[in-house]
Amino acid sequence: MLVIPAVDMKNKKCVQLIQGNPDKKHVELDNPPEIAKKWVSEGAEMLHLVDLDGALDGKRVNDEFIEEIIKTSGVPVQIGGGIRSIEDAVYLVEKGAKKVIIGTIAVEKPEIIKELSENIGSEKIMVSLDAKDGKVVIKGWKEKTKYTPVEIGKILEEMGAGSILFTNVDSEGLLNGINIEPTKELVENLKIPIVASGGVTTIDDLLKFKEIGVYGVVVGSAIYKNMINLKDAIEAVK
C-alpha cells in the first residue's frame, strides 16, 4: 500500500485546511516544490497535488509550481483541483501528470469520463468522490447529491474511471481519526483501485486501511503536524 503525501497549494503556498475551509488552516508554508522534495527524500513513491485555488475558484494559479514538482520530484504525481474540462486534463497529462483527479464534473456528467478515457486512457483518470453523511458532495463540499459513493462509483467505473480517490469529509482535516466503513464498502463493491483520504492521524489508521485492501492512502495534516513520521509510516505498511 502506498502512503501518498499531500501537497495542497493555495496562493502559491503549501497549506492544510480544516474540513476544506479556506479560512481555517492548520498549516501554511512557503515553497511547495521544496516541501514535495522533502517528502520524496523521506521515501514517498508518489505525490498528491491539489490546486486549491482551482478547486475553490475555478482558476489555476499554481501551474508553475505544479510543473516544477512534476519535473523535479522524481516520482509520479497525481493532480486535482479545478480540472473542469477535457482540455484541463489533457494539459496536465501532457505536462507529465501520472493521474488527473476529476471531481465535481465527473459526478454531474459521468459521460465525460468515457470521453476522457478515450483521450488520455483510463489508467490516467482518478475520480474524486467526497462523502458527507453517506452521500457524495460536490463543488468544494458545498452541495450534497442524492448518490451514495458506491452508486456513483459503479457508474464511473463503467464509464472508464481508472481509480477512485475517496474522502470521508466527516473526518477530513479534523485530526481525530478515521471511519473505515464507507471506504470498505467501496473496496468491496468496485473492481478499480481505491485511494483513501481524510482523517488519518496514526500509523494504526494506515494499517486499518491496508487491511481492507486500499491501493494507497493520502496523508496531509498528520505529517505536517508531526503526528506521523512519513518514513515510519511507509515502512509500517510495506
Swiss-Prot record:
Localisation:
Cytoplasm
Q: Give me any GO biological process, just one.
A: L-tryptophan biosynthetic process
Protein name as annotated? 1-(5-phosphoribosyl)-5-[(5-phosphoribosylamino)methylideneamino] imidazole-4-carboxamide isomerase
Among the GO molecular function terms of this UniProt record, one is: 1-(5-phosphoribosyl)-5-[(5-phosphoribosylamino)methylideneamino]imidazole-4-carboxamide isomerase activity
**Reactions performed catalytically:** 1-(5-phospho-beta-D-ribosyl)-5-[(5-phospho-beta-D-ribosylamino)methylideneamino]imidazole-4-carboxamide = 5-[(5-phospho-1-deoxy-D-ribulos-1-ylimino)methylamino]-1-(5-phospho-beta-D-ribosyl)imidazole-4-carboxamide
Q: Which UniProt keywords apply?
A: Amino-acid biosynthesis, Cytoplasm, Histidine biosynthesis, Isomerase
Q: Where is the active site?
A: 8, 130
Q: Which CDD domains match?
A: HisA
Could you tell me which NCBIfam families the record lists for this protein? 1-(5-phosphoribosyl)-5-[(5-phosphoribosylamino)methylideneamino]imidazole-4-carboxamide isomerase (TIGR00007), PRK13585.1 (NF010112)
